[in-house]
Structure formats: C-alpha cells, structure tokens
Amino acid sequence: KNNIYNIYMLNNDTRKLIDYFIHDYKYNAELKNNNNNLFQQIYHQLNALDNVNFKSNLSVNSFKTFELLSSSFIPKHIKIEINKTKKIYTYKCNINNSNTTIYIKFYVSEYSKITITKQKQMLKKILLVIKFLFLYKSNNTINNLTIHIHMSKHKKFLPKNNTDILNQNNVNTAVTYACAKEGECIIYRKEEWFKVLIHELMHSLCLDFSSFNYTLLKKKNTQ
C-alpha cells in the first residue's frame, strides 16, 4: 500500500480517505485482473516518464489578476488572499514536443508560502502528470495551458446544519475551463492539491465526458 501511495504522491488526507472507502471493498476476480493489468500499464508509463528531464524557463513577476479569479466557485476570503500575492513565479515549458505551451504559476505571499525548492518539487509532479495525460488527450487544438497555484491553508468543511446547501467553502478546491483552446485552471487550496489538479487536467484536456455525443448516448440507452 505504501508503494502505491509513493507512486501517486498522495498526501495524508487523501490516504485516510482511500483507507476509509476501500476498507472491506469487494470485487470479482475478472475485474480485479483487468484492473491489475491497467495499473501495471500506468505504472510502467509513469516510471518511464519519471526518468525524463523537463526543461522550463522561470520568470518572476508582480501580481496581475485574471478572469478565472472572478469565478463564484472560489471563496471570497481566498480571493482576498490571492489578491495580496507579492510575487508570481512562472515556469514555461513544452510537453511531448507538442505545440502546446504550459505555464505553471506559483502565487507566493504570507498566505501561500511556496519556496523555490518546494516549487521545483511540485513542478516535477505537475509536469509528470501532464506528460502522462498528454498520451491520452483527445483535444488536439489546445494552444496554451496555464495553471495558477495558490496554496491556501483553508480546508473544506461540512456545514453545521444538515439542511444547509453545500457551497464553495464545503466542496471546491479548484476551477478550470474544460476543453478550451486557451486552457486554464486554478488550484487554490493546499489540501489535496495534487489529486485535485489531476481531476482538473482531465477536464482541461477533454478526458472527461464533455466531448461525448449525449444524443447518441441517450439513443443507445433507450434501445
């Protein structure tokens, strides 16, 4: 189990959730064998990519707002934190010899303390998963992909009242534009940031259901 955690670089919060949900989990032998084959394939692909050196150019700039920051999915108190950013460290690189340029921006302030050493550690993880997902992406028209990272310490929490409607303080950690030519996403919590980034990248690279033909799918379901 620890080896699996190390491979996917999961933090303690995610590990606890996995332990909770997979405890006593049962599935048939055929499904287990199929899953094992898939996991082995993914492991070997990640292992091969992990040995690749990524080249990037670093620039440091002052804070400049961006459209995605106005999203209602970002809590107001975290927006205030982001707007107090002192420096933005931007790493520019290309993946798999593609025409897509990747911009990874770390927002550094008293609310988001990310040292250069930490940035480089995170950068390697991010580029590894992007390079892996690029092997499967269906969106060939994406020109640029910009990832904004603000490591707020504010965690998600459940409302005190069971009848309250869940909002951005309870369930959201990121926002993204799905299948856009100018791809963009923002990760604004330190909590489970890497797991959430993988999820958002699947939206950005059209690896989700957004490109499905729902009319055809509905027709097949009614047959």
Put a short name on every predicted segment.
Residues 1-5, 12-13, 98, 223:
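Compositionally biased low-complexity segments enriched in polar/charged residues
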Residues 6-95:
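Long, contiguous juxta-domain segments that are non-catalytic but functionally important
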Residues 66-181, 190:
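Auxiliary, metal-adjacent structural segments of Zn-dependent hydrolase domains
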Residues 134-137, 205, 209:
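Eukaryotic basic, amphipathic alpha-helical target segments in cytosolic regions
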Residues 185, 189-196, 218:
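Extended, charge-rich low-complexity interaction segments
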Residues 195-208:
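Active-site recognition of the HExxH zinc-binding catalytic motif
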Residues 209-223:
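Post-HExxH zinc-binding segment in Zn-dependent metallohydrolases
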